[in-house]
Amino acid sequence: MLEQMGIAAKAASYKLALLSSCEKNRVLEKIADELEAQMESILSANVQDVEQARANGLSEAMLDRLALTPARLKAIADDVRQVCNLADPAGQVIDGGLLDSGLRLERRRVPLGVVGVIYEARPNVTVDVASLCLKTGNAVILRGGKETHRTNAATVLVIQKALKACDLPEAAVQAIDNPDRSLVSEMLRMDKYIDMLIPRGGAGLHKLCREQSTIPVITGGIGVCHIFVDSSADIAPALKIIVNAKTQRPSTCNTVETLLVHQDIAERFLPALSKQMAESGVTLHGDETVMQALHGPAKLVALKPEELDNEFLSLDLNVVVVENMDGAIAHIREHGTQHSDAILTCDMHNAARFVNEVDSAAVYVNASTRFTDGGQFGLGAEVAVSTQKLHARGPMGLEALTTYKWIGFGDGTIRA
């Protein structure tokens, strides 16, 4: 089954690579229209997925990840339309020039070909990835989690209907709808057909892909994000940033999970933090210093060492008091995932040092980690957030779904 999907996807990718930007935008507009027109069927499938997930005991954080509402689905359709407004990188000439030999050389962006994406309980990923791949002239094979297999299947049918209406192969966007986990291992070995693989899920999925894939893999999306409250931080705006970074949407990978507090500001800052977190419904997981310093009003539990390496994806926040900037940077290097980290400070020397020494895909000064997002960065919908350093890093927009080829123009030109 998968080999036939790969053959069809590869054939579709050749046709997609020839489309003009206008033709690709026409497809995307049709997809957005169909998502709204077929909203009832998608939401009906999603309700079944959510009910099944709840019966299986999934956490509220996970249920929020997989749930769709009319407003969320409308926002997804609007995101597709926003992709239409983005510049198409395919075909762009990056650089080039006339060589001494008389050969005119240029380096041109081209589609990757076929992209494979393995993801878990986020049904919006189906549309986000499909729209970005189509915009850049790539075909895509999707393998969503079993928790959302009905939603994903319904969504892909809508996308394929739009492709067919635009006289394009339905195989340009395909989904593996069989929940059999052994198919993931089979997909990881489809290097004959898939040019790049992107896993979006937990640490276990990323480890599996790194160890078993014969396809180049872009890993990321695991966000143990930190905020360091420096000794010079202005407490009022610092609290506002922390509330945003923790509570705006706790189930996302750019949510702060650990707060590092400079010991020189801890006595003044921690009581204010506790009051604010109590109002926001956040449970604090405190180290020994925090446990001794606070006695309410926020719910406070003792921090377990293993929690420093975990994504809560819920209204829980680690709070650790550090001796100085060195301690904060060392902590992030040991426990961070190179996703998004921030410093809150009024000392620009410390800010510059933090930016230079924290090796994450996104580093912020006096701002929320929640900004690490393709839309917020002006990239449109993102296919993933890469925490590795090769090919792509940070939110992966359109350019990350292209490679380049060298093209030489001559006039009977030969090498001397």
Swiss-Prot record:
It is found in: Cytoplasm. Its EC number is 1.2.1.41. PROSITE patterns: PROA. It comes from the Bacteria. One of its GO terms (cellular component) is cytoplasm. It holds the Pfam family Aldedh. It is an enzyme of class 1 (oxidoreductase). It catalyses: L-glutamate 5-semialdehyde + phosphate + NADP(+) = L-glutamyl 5-phosphate + NADPH + H(+). Its main location: cytoplasm. GO terms for molecular function: glutamate-5-semialdehyde dehydrogenase activity; NADP binding. One of its GO terms (biological process) is L-proline biosynthetic process. The keyword Transmembrane helix does not apply. CDD domains: ALDH_F18-19_ProA-GPR (cd07079). Keywords: Amino-acid biosynthesis, Cytoplasm, NADP, Oxidoreductase, Proline biosynthesis. Pathway: Amino-acid biosynthesis; L-proline biosynthesis; L-glutamate 5-semialdehyde from L-glutamate: step 2/2. Belongs to the gamma-glutamyl phosphate reductase family. HAMAP family: ProA (MF_00412). Catalyzes the NADPH-dependent reduction of L-glutamate 5-phosphate into L-glutamate 5-semialdehyde and phosphate. The product spontaneously undergoes cyclization to form 1-pyrroline-5-carboxylate. This is Gamma-glutamyl phosphate reductase. It comes from Salmonella typhi. The gene is proA.
